[in-house]
Amino acid sequence: MKKGFTLIEMLVVIGIIAVLMGTGAGAYSGIVKAAEKKRCQELVADTATALTALYQKNGAWPKALRRGNATDVELDKDAALPLAKAGYMSLSMNDGKLSGYDRFGIVSPWGAAHIKKRGAAASLSDKIGSRSLQDHILHCALDLDGDGIIEGALVGGESVDIRATAAVWCCGKDGVIERYSTGLKKDDAYSWSYGQTQGVK
């Protein structure tokens, strides 16, 4: 009676291990993507909550947030500053300006990771994949007339009415803010639910 494995038996075992590793790698990739999307979702929800609290406290929107008709405002260093000053978001400040990792405003988790990696050398024109750091700044729309409805929020160029005081959205890892109707199925994150856009009059 022989002891040990034959070459065929070893190849079968190696093949089984390879299949299991391939399956595990695919599952791991899905878990990582879901975790990234969840972090982004939490960021937009927290930012919308902070904006709503700021409005409720002051009874009006700060001038830095009332750009144009406030249907697509970048939460850049100027627009994010009122949130930092009011203490609603823990953003780094120095001499009344955003500083450190927060010096560009509120950015996606991928933008934040890039800024931390590059440190002081980071700039808005830096590439993250095929897009720039500028593309990773969060966007918001505001209810300017106080009726609880944001009329005509421009989400990826698509006009959307939303039942909310403040709505915040963010691109996915690709740096592209999709049209709202297609972004729901992709990697973009929104502070509101689909139901908040239905039957708005």
Which sequence ranges carry the predicted segments?
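Extended low-polarity, hydrophobic cluster-rich segments
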Residues: C40, A84-G87, T165-A166
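Short, surface-exposed interaction loops/tails
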Residues: K37-K38, A45, T49-T52, S125-K201
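Short, ordered coil/turn segments that flank beta-strands lining enzyme active or ligand-binding pockets
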Residues: K2, K57, P109, L144-G146, ...
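Short, glycine/small-hydrophobic-rich surface segments
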Residues: L51-W110, L124
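Extracellular/surface-associated beta-sandwich interaction domains
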Residues: L20, G30-T49, Y55-W61, L65
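N-terminal single-pass transmembrane signal-anchor helix
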Residues: M1-I31, E36
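Glycine-rich, aromatic-lined ligand/substrate-binding cores of catalytic
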Residues: S108, A112-A113, G119, S132
